[in-house]
């Protein structure tokens, strides 16, 4: 199974260095980094990387997460033979055994997965939590504010969800290719 990491970065060079170290150690088949017009030395550092399988896409402007992920997705879909694409930002650090854990999942029934995104203290990042159902009424929105766990999947099992965030998403490259236009880069952060 060929897995590509798609990392979007903007002006967080030290975090990107850590993310890259951990991404390389995790053993991805290839890595695509979209540099969103960073001005902090990122472009220069990226040009010094010599590991095989790393592709750098330097943009002149910051297109935000959505724009960066769209550019990276377009590149991967037209230049890669990856089976799966793992999406994350420069401040996300994949666990060393992420690919081993992913290989144990039954990928025949699902084409998109969402990783559990945690902060450095091991707490779930609320902005990256998928919804098992999206609040659709005023009552459900208030209920979500009081009891968000009722709208979030269990952490220890595969569960159907209605939403995913870019950070932590794992998607079949063929599905990604069929849905490139669904990445709305004008939203900057989310699609």
What are these model-predicted stretches?
Residues 2-7, 22-23, 29-34:
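Hydrophobic targeting segments
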Residues 12-25:
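Short, well-formed alpha-helical segments that are part of the catalytic scaffolds
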Residues 35-44, 61, 92-93:
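A conserved acidic beta->alpha catalytic loop
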Residues 59-76:
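Glycine-rich, basic loop-to-helix element that forms the pyrophosphate-binding segment
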Residues 81-91:
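Short beta-strand-to-loop acidic/aromatic patch adjacent to the donor-nucleotide binding site
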Residues 97-128:
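Conserved donor NDP-sugar-binding/catalytic core segment of glycosyltransferases
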Residues 151-171:
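A recurrent flexible, glycine/aromatic-enriched loop bordering the glycosyltransferase active site
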Residues 161-164, 168, 177-191:
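Donor nucleotide-sugar recognition loop
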């Amino acid at each position: 199974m060929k897995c590509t990491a798609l990392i979007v970065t903007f002006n967080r060079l030290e975090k990107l260095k850590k993310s890259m170290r951990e991404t390389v150690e995790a053993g991805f088949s290839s890595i695509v980094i979209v540099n969103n017009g960073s001005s902090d030395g990122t472009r220069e550092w990226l040009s010094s990387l010599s590991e095989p399988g790393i592709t750098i896409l330097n943009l002149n402007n910051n297109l935000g997460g959505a724009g960066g992920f769209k550019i990276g997705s377009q590149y991967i879909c037209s230049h890669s033979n990856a089976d799966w694409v793992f999406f994350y930002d420069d401040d996300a650090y994949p666990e060393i055994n992420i690919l081993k854990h992913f290989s144990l999942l039954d990928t025949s029934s699902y084409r998109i997965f969402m990783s559990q995104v945690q902060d450095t203290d091991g707490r779930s990042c609320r902005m990256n939590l998928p919804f098992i159902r999206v609040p659709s009424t005023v009552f459900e929105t208030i209920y979500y504010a009081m009891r968000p766990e009722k709208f979030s999947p269990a952490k220890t099992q595969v569960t159907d969800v209605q939403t995913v965030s870019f950070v932590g998403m794992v998607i079949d490259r063929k599905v990604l290719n069929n849905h490139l236009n669904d990445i709305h880069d004008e939203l900057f952060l989310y699609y």
